[in-house]
Every structure is written in C-alpha cells, then in structure tokens.
Amino acid sequence: MQLYVHIELDEPLVLPINYNHIIQVVIYRTLSVMPDYTDFLHNRGYSSGHRQYKMFRFSQLRGKYRIKEKNIIFYSFIELEIRSPEPILIKLLDGGFRYGGITFG
C-alpha cells in the first residue's frame, strides 16, 4: 500500500540537507498511538532467516526548494510518498496525518 502526502506550507520549511531522520521521527511519532506496534516496527521489524526488514520506506520530499549552505528550504508545498506492505501502518499514518497534523522538529 502507499500513502501520498501533500502539505501546504504557511511559511518556508528549513531542513538540514540530510533530513531522512526527521521524516522517520515524524512517521514514528504519528504511529506512537500504538506504542507496542511502534516498538515492534522500530526495534524488531519482521525477519526471515537472519535478515530483518523494516516495514515502510519513504520518498525524498518533493516541492519547490532552494539549497542554502547546509540546509534545504521548501516553499509553498511539499509532497511525500510512504509505502508499506502493512495496510494497518498506512491507515494509521493516514489517520494521524489527517487528524493530528504533521510537525517537523
């Protein structure tokens, strides 16, 4: 399953160029309404043999941006795609983003 997120920005969003950890925090914070599930995803995930698999992946942020020093500045909107084979994960994120909003930082 996939979730497409479109966020209208009231003001420019300034992030470090390496912002992936911030997106992960946003995702795990949104999923924290189910602490046991969040803990499972973050600390264990699914395994097959000796390999462990995380149950979601996300795209880079898309939108109009400018690079300034070690930051990336997004203007007007950003878009993000999150994919997972777990329907519950996508539904939790969708509900959390719609009703709880998204905050970076």
Where are these regions (language model features)?
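RNA-interacting cores
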Residues: 1-105
